[in-house]
């Protein structure tokens, strides 16, 4: 992963403003839009130590995450008082397993991930610069089973007004990246003048958006 050092430094210095202390309300509100079944497998790319993993594990029998930072993976299990089984894999990755949860620590692009029926992306696509997004989407498309669905949370703002991450990924770019799949925007939350991104960072506009992306093949 080409920006690995950047993310290792973020976790090492605890600069993790992207981490939410609670389950993302957009997940709990819109997960049902995927018509998920308990037996369907779930993948959470670039998962950090998100609380969303624990929530998803209450809904599904197998939830798999992938995270570059070993600090993040170990913190997730420690903060939940879980004692995982740890398996080294080919010297490049470690697999952490506890009940319904499995997390691969290491490079997402080379981790031996299982194919998934459902993918949840809250902070993966928007964490990557434009030149890496095509490779990332090719990777998750290759990991999605026929008939699989993706719940994607994205941001839309004038990129020239703020350096990412998180980056702006517009509906037009999402439709281009996932060409051949069915893309539906479920939700758009347009920030008002009191939102920190506008009031404090001076953006002219900012919105958070939720998409369902379906693999009809």
Curated annotation (Swiss-Prot):
Keywords: Cytoplasm, Methyltransferase, S-adenosyl-L-methionine, Transferase. GO terms for molecular function: thiopurine S-methyltransferase activity. Its main location: cytoplasm. SUPFAM superfamilies: S-adenosyl-L-methionine-dependent methyltransferases. It catalyses: S-adenosyl-L-methionine + a thiopurine = S-adenosyl-L-homocysteine + a thiopurine S-methylether. The keyword Magnesium does not apply. GO terms for cellular component: cytoplasm. The keyword Cytoplasm applies. Its EC number is 2.1.1.67. It is found in: Cytoplasm. S-adenosyl-L-methionine binds at residues 11, 46, 67, 122. GO terms for biological process: methylation; response to metal ion. Pfam families: TPMT. Belongs to the class I-like SAM-binding methyltransferase superfamily. TPMT family. HAMAP family: Thiopur_methtran. This is Thiopurine S-methyltransferase. It comes from Vibrio vulnificus (strain YJ016).
